[in-house]
């Protein structure tokens, strides 16, 4: 910290906020996941981690409730160029598959693009397994792992690590969508399926609290009502209570 000036110009040193901490020194590690291969309406979230890193040096560090906020030891490794390249390649093929669904339906699209769908699902499984292992290592080292995506599907590996590390935990989801669809568009780990997968796979998940949901299917509403772990605060109810 002797060379870090919280009142000076942010230095683009490769770490988030230009902070001077290494991973070994950090209490919190941000894991960038440049992935949006299942995004069904518009791409670009895979660029999010790098964009956030690039903009982070523009921030100031005064906080009314946290004295000397800049002493929070946070580290962010470089965005994986390998996974960004894999994502971009699969996105191009996946877009053709998604476009065909919107014209001819899911069954017809899968008959033509089945190999593409399988490749994306397999790559996603590998990504999730890699992320889980990375998060497990950080948890065992006494650090707090955070995922910086990327589409909504990306944190599942982190959630699996938490599930393996704790006897019980909860998820707070602030979102417009419930993400409770089962393999949306055939993607086993779709951005629209992460909370469905969490409820299905995580044995120690005790509560899923959803806040601000405003765009949801009837089947998702039914699942939300039937699973006692799910507590959904719909946007329309919050608005009615506020006004």
Regions found by a protein language model. Name each.
Residues 2-243:
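Conserved alpha-helical scaffold segments that buttress catalytic/binding sites
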